[in-house]
Amino acid sequence: MQAKAHFAQYLIEQAWAKTLIDGQSHKPWSWADTYPVAKLSIEQAKRPNHFDGPASNDSLYVLAGASGRNLAFGPALVLSSAPAGAQGNTVIAGHRDTHFAMLNGISVGRRLALQTAAGREIVYQVVATQVVHESQTELMAPSEDNRLTLITCYPFDVLQGGAELRFVVQAIPVEPETAAQSEGATVDRTLEPKVA
């Protein structure tokens, strides 16, 4: 499953590059029933000799619709939530053992960047992390304020399914100038599409 999940991100990246060029939705492969709707980057804090997740500032491509099939290929936007870049609560779900394994150890203050299909980059700051029961869905509810909510199963070190707990990260938008000046974090500015 992990190999499929990581390989799919390369195909999704190509579809995303096309979306940024022409503004249209592009399927990553011919039989896909989804398409990328955003690009998510999670910044790594500058802490010497500390490793709290996979590699550097790798970006993840977010698919439309958080179905089980889509989550096998990458994080996915919960369709009942606000679209990336729109007013409201944008909710993205991902598997704890693949793409959202990088949320393990994320802390308040960390910066996230979300690129929309229009090419606009929104920088967010993590304001809360918490573990909740799967029945506590109020964190996914629509809101009038702008926020980004990331959700994955918990605990991270359990590889079998059936988890009743969810790890939730909540972030709010910050001004780009403020984000770039953040002490102890770097901003991933490699959000331009790669065109072959």
What do these predicted regions represent?
Residues 1-196:
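Solvent-exposed, non-transmembrane regions of membrane-associated and secreted proteins
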